[in-house]
Amino acid sequence: MESNQYGHVTVLLAEAVEALGVKADGLYIDGTFGRGGHSAEILKALGPQGRLLGIDKDPRARRTAMERFSGDDRFLFRQGSFADMASFVSELQWPGVDGVLLDLGVSSPQLDEAERGFSFMQDGPLDMRMDPDSGLSASEWVNTAKEEEISKVLWDLGEERFARRMAKAIVAARQTQPITRTLQLAEIVAAANPRWEKGKNPATRAFQAIRIFINRELDDLAQGLEQAFGVLKPGGRLTVISFHSLEDRMVKQYMRDIVRGPKTPKWLPVVDDAPPKAKLVGKKIRAGETEVVANVRARSAVMRVLEKC
């Protein structure tokens, strides 16, 4: 775990970089640059010929990248989604990469900066966009979406059992006045939640669901996993840290499917002797007790590693 002056506490820092098996002259991608915690550690292990590409949607991440690593010729940055990493690799004319790291979800600064609109703990404009210059804000969506759509998003992406009640409450509230503030939305969904989970804010699942929807996080993840595996060289590793069950299930299933290969119908007379495309590296890793005590956000972190054959 690393805490730096850029306001972000990096989860599973040593474990993630160790899992990549960084080679001094290797080519690597930090697909979720954030505030550069993982990138800084990867650069420590790279030699003069090694290269690291940082990717992030957030324009503030770009500014941080320039501040931290502008004098390091081994580091490059592209603002965008890791779902487009193959195009960045092609643009750089890299033959492939030796490792890709994805640290999913929202970063500490994004949560802690009220004006970004991610947090239900402090008041701010209801935005939630990783890239504030792209797409609908959360406020625009909750004020225009149909009740059925809101309910579906809360259920599918937040696994919120009171999704229908919350959607109904949101639609009723916006008829009185537009929903434009984070605490305004938090109060609406909390009031529609009759059974608060112990130790969890009643708005947690709703905010998670809306954030995932606004930023197309699961769509990006599905595409990003495919692209990451596609750009890996043989022997290259994909390391993914997820923070909620929806992400982790997708990562687990994708890695399992790659390792097992395509299913062949039992009735086909085919000898299944094709070499595997990939192998799992170890078991899933969780943050240790010491890290969780120091950073409660590490509690839900799960890391999985895949190596291309």
Curated annotation (Swiss-Prot):
Keyword Repeat set for record: no
GO terms of biological process kind: rRNA base methylation
Entry annotated with the keyword Oxidoreductase: no
One MF term in the entry's GO annotations: rRNA (cytosine-N4-)-methyltransferase activity
Catalytic activity: cytidine(1402) in 16S rRNA + S-adenosyl-L-methionine = N(4)-methylcytidine(1402) in 16S rRNA + S-adenosyl-L-homocysteine + H(+)
Key words, A-Z: Cytoplasm, Methyltransferase, rRNA processing, S-adenosyl-L-methionine, Transferase
Pfam (any one): Methyltransf_5
EC number annotated for this UniProt entry: 2.1.1.199
Protein location: Cytoplasm
Predominant place of localization: cytoplasm
Binding of S-adenosyl-L-methionine, residues: G36, G37, H38, D56, F82, D103, Q110
One GO CC annotation: cytoplasm
Superkingdom field: Bacteria
NCBIfam families tied to this protein: 16S rRNA (cytosine(1402)-N(4))-methyltransferase RsmH (TIGR00006)
Similarity-based family: Belongs to the methyltransferase superfamily. RsmH family.
Protein function: Specifically methylates the N4 position of cytidine in position 1402 (C1402) of 16S rRNA.
Protein name: Ribosomal RNA small subunit methyltransferase H
